[in-house]
A protein has these predicted regions:
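Conserved eukaryotic protein kinase-like
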Residues: 1-338
Length: 338
């Protein structure tokens, strides 16, 4: 009996020490080197959110709350991660690595973090106009065509920074309207880097078992093929159709031929009936066709047929010609727009 108690006591001490080491590990493994972020205690963020009362939204790994940081009275969005032991810890580390050392006007800015015991929180700039999803699908005032084109360019330029302009190439892996936030000027910014993959300088592809959101993930995810930056291009293409048409990528309440947005867009493009996509909205035909062509190139099943995001930006800006795209699901065409 005494021996059993001694073993139990020793085991408890070892478990305690392991957990303490694990909690400190983020401080000691080089994760925060060269990252100029403010470290907050849980008590500070609890006070900033008034006990986490004002909920802004929920995601797969946690909940976002509105808060006010006393220093400077800055309004912020605070993401409190849940299921920290597994997925939450991974999301925390991914977001810290991905945007802790990046800055771009089309990326949501990360101000600080909390790594206090088992608590994992991230402090972001507050985006007063919510998500692009709410703006497109729930707002009484729908975006104008000018706003749609500006939003599309905002997001494309943010992805361009991640893929080609920041120190470490980043594949976001979860581009969708819910992860695009709008500031007070309706400027769109990319958020939620919990699934992001960082590539080494000599690396162009990666393997990962983690997938983004159904409907936005590129076909190569389903075949367990290498993931490249072209996966983000595919997701952007699906979202671009949602921006153009102001509807979800799948809507079971619509007629059968319109249920899957990407298929319907291609059918309308082939039939020369693009006006069906925007209904009563007044849009210049050439501008609408340009956006549709960009989207159709982005969603090609074959990754090599998709343009790099830099080319996507140029096409959206109207500075390069866009050839007629093949059927997105056709592997017969040898056309490339790279």
């Amino acid at each position: 009996m005494v021996f059993a108690l001694i073993v139990l006591a020793i085991t408890s001490i070892l478990i305690y020490r392991y957990r303490a080491w694990k909690n400190k590990n983020i401080e000691n493994d080089g994760l925060l080197e060269d990252v100029t972020l403010r470290s907050y205690t849980y008590a500070e963020l609890d006070k900033a959110t008034n006990g986490f009362l004002d909920e802004l939204g929920r995601g797969a790994f946690g909940t976002v709350f509105k808060g006010v940081i006393p220093n400077g009275r800055r309004v912020v969005a605070i993401k409190r991660l849940e299921n920290v032991v597994a997925e939450g810890e991974r999301e925390f580390r991914n977001e810290m690595k991905a945007i802790g050392r990046t800055y771009h006007k089309n990326l949501v800015k990360l101000y600080g973090y909390c790594h206090d015991g088992n608590n994992r929180l991230l402090v972001y700039e507050y985006m007063s106009n919510g998500s692009l999803a709410k703006f497109l699908f729930e707002s009484e005032r729908k975006p104008s065509w000018e706003e749609k084109t500006r939003i599309a360019l905002n997001v494309a330029r943010g992805i361009l920074y991640l893929h080609e302009e920041c120190e470490t190439q980043i594949i976001h892996c979860d581009i969708k309207p819910e992860n695009i936030l709008m500031d007070e000027h309706k400027c769109a910014k990319i958020a939620d880097f919990g699934l992001a993959k960082l590539l080494m300088p000599n690396q162009t592809r990666t393997y990962t078992g983690i997938r983004g959101t159904r409907g936005y993930v590129a076909p190569e995810w389903h075949g367990n093929l290498p993931i490249t930056a072209k996966a983000d291009v595919y997701s952007f293409g699906i979202m671009l159709f949602e921006i153009i048409c102001g509807r979800r990528h799948v809507d079971m309440d619509l007629p059968e031929d319109e249920v899957v947005l990407a298929n319907w867009v291609y059918d309308c493009f082939q039939a020369g009936e693009l006006d069906k996509l925007v209904k009563d909205e007044e849009v210049e035909r050439n501008k609408l066709e340009r956006m549709v062509r960009v989207g159709l190139w982005c969603i090609q099943d074959e990754p090599s047929l998709r343009p790099p995001i830099k080319k996507v930006v140029l096409m959206l800006e109207g500075t390069v010609e866009i050839p007629a795209p093949p059927s997105p699901t056709s592997f017969l065409s040898s056309m490339e727009v790279n």
